[in-house]
Design a protein with these regions (language model features):
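Zinc-dependent deaminase
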Residues: 1-19, 83-150
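Short beta->alpha transition motifs characteristic of CBS
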Residues: 38-45
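A cytosolic small-molecule/anion-sensing beta-strand core signal
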Residues: 33-34, 61, 73
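A short, polar/acidic, helix/strand-boundary loop motif
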Residues: 2, 45-46
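Small-residue (primarily alanine) positions within well-ordered alpha-helices
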Residues: 12, 16-19, 29, 39, ...
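A short, polar/charged loop-to-alpha-helix boundary motif
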Residues: 47-58
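Immediate flanking context of iron-sulfur cluster ligation sites
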Residues: 69-82
C-alpha cells in the first residue's frame, strides 16, 4: 500500500462524512487517474430518489463525463466500503483498473465478502483489488451513523 492510497482513501472518507451530514448512508468514493482525483462522490440515493446513486456509480458517471469516454482505463477507484454487485459490475464495464476499499460489507459486499464478482471466471476483465485501507476509520463512520439512528 502506497502513501497515496492513504491520501485518496482519506478523501473518500471526507465524502462519506458529507453523506452522513446529509442523512445518506455514509459511503464515499474518489476516482483517480495518474495521481489526480478526477471525480469524487458520496451516496445520494435518498437526495436524488435514485437507487443507483451509490458513491461508486456517481463517481464513475462523473469521471466518464469529465474525460469524455465511457472507458476509465488506468484509473483507481477508492471507496470507503466494499462495493455491491451493481457497483462492481459498473467497474468492469468502465474498465476501472484498480479498486481500493476500506471496510468489508457483510450484507452484500460483492468483491470479497459475500460474492466475488470481479474474480468470476465469466468476467473478461480483471480489476486489481486492495482491501482494508483505513478499514477501522471507514467502519467507524458507518457504525457511528447507524448508532445515531437506533
Amino acid at each position: 500500500m502506497a502513501e497515496s492510497d492513504l491520501e485518496f482513501m482519506r478523501a473518500a472518507l471526507d465524502e462519506a462524512r458529507t453523506a452522513a451530514e446529509r442523512g445518506e448512508v455514509p459511503i464515499g468514493a474518489v476516482l483517480v487517474h495518474e495521481g489526480i482525483i478526477i471525480s469524487r462522490a458520496h451516496n445520494c440515493t435518498l437526495t436524488d430518489n435514485d437507487p443507483t446513486a451509490h458513491a461508486e456509480m456517481v463517481a464513475i458517471r462523473e469521471a466518464a463525463q469529465t474525460i469524455g469516454n465511457h472507458r476509465l482505463n488506468g484509473t483507481s477507484l477508492y471507496v470507503t466500503v466494499e462495493p455491491c454487485a451493481m457497483c462492481a459490475g459498473a467497474m468492469i464495464q468502465a474498465r476501472v483498473a484498480r479498486l481500493v476499499y476500506g471496510c468489508a460489507e457483510q450484507k452484500g459486499g460483492a468483491v470479497r465478502t459475500c460474492f466475488q464478482i470481479l474474480d468470476h471466471p465469466a468476467v473478461n476483465y480483471r480489476v486489481e483489488v486492495i482491501s482494508g485501507v483505513l478499514a477501522q476509520e471507514c467502519a467507524a463512520v458507518m457504525q457511528d451513523f447507524f448508532a445515531q439512528r437506533r
